[in-house]
Amino acid sequence: PTDPFSRPSQYKRMGWGFKMGYGSGKNYIDLYLLRACDSENSIDEIWRQQIPPQENIVVGLKGRVTPFKWLAFTANMATSVFNTDLRAPEIPITTKFDKIFDVKYSSLMRFAGDLNANLNLKGVNASISYRMVQPDYTSLGTYYMSNNYHSLGLTLGTTLFNKISLSGTFSGQADNLSKEQLYTTCGYVYAANASMRLGSHFTVTAGYNGYLQSQRAGTRAVNDTTKIHRMMSSYSLTPSYSYETDLLGHSVSLTANMTQNEDLNKFATGESDVKTKALGLSYNVDVKPIETDFTLTYSHQESKGFKSKYISDVASLGTSRSFLKEKNLNLSASVSLCYNEIVRQSKRLSLGGDFSTSYN
């Protein structure tokens, strides 16, 4: 805190914006406008030499069209005109933006948007979406935003016999829209989930999640020995049982999970591969006469990598209760015992506690 150069200074930034729209909940269009600008003299001169003042205008459109009860389209689009350095010289030509924005040699105009189609037919829900963000798309209205990529996503869900719920998702993404990177990175995320209710007390949920990352040539051919080609797969199974009496409400759940993270490069040595197995057990009881919940949990995790193995066991006991007439004062407390071991390296046993209160 005593070092004046430990953290860069920041310009005083002024901004304004508005939103206007027309339509109903099913069919509408909204217009957004944001303008933000840094005040060049708001920081010390020593910092001005290192940090350029910036300016930004963003125009956005958001809309929805519902041609049928079972089909709806939504879209979001934005154009950002960004001056990366207000001190840069102006372009000596007349443009239609002169009255609202000084076009400089540091100015960038970039586009971002997405389009979604949603389908809902007799127990089947489906959607498809596409998103594109141009390289160097930047806005002073957001702290951080990924750019230089496009993606396509699909989702599908249905219910069978009013007892079984099925859902699946898939999305693919690739960067290097500018075609200027050395390599193009592609990522694919996919998942499938199923949930079945047996009677009025028992439920079973199973799921699979996967991620595949690969690399293609950009301005340079990919080297087979260093090519990125990784896959992560995760499987889970969760049976749960619950029932109530006049005095108590009981719920028990068991969770089993296995995750495999591996390098698919044929030249890989397996040093970065990790396989994790986890098992969890939870029991909750609601004591109705005193309106208090008690929870007992236990979890075991075992991760095995290249010449390494990690083991963790955690047991905890917690309680919570709401007070006052509106039940808006909440108190909770818990105590936990944790055992961690890195095989042939270290072992640790720790005890912890937690107490929290909230009012809403």
Residue ranges and their predicted role:
Residues 52, 56-360:
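Exposed, low-structure sequence patches enriched in small/polar residues
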Residues 19-25, 118-122:
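Eukaryotic alpha-helical scaffold "rod" segments
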Residues 1-21, 30-52, 133, 137-147:
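Surface-exposed coil loops of outer-membrane beta-barrel proteins
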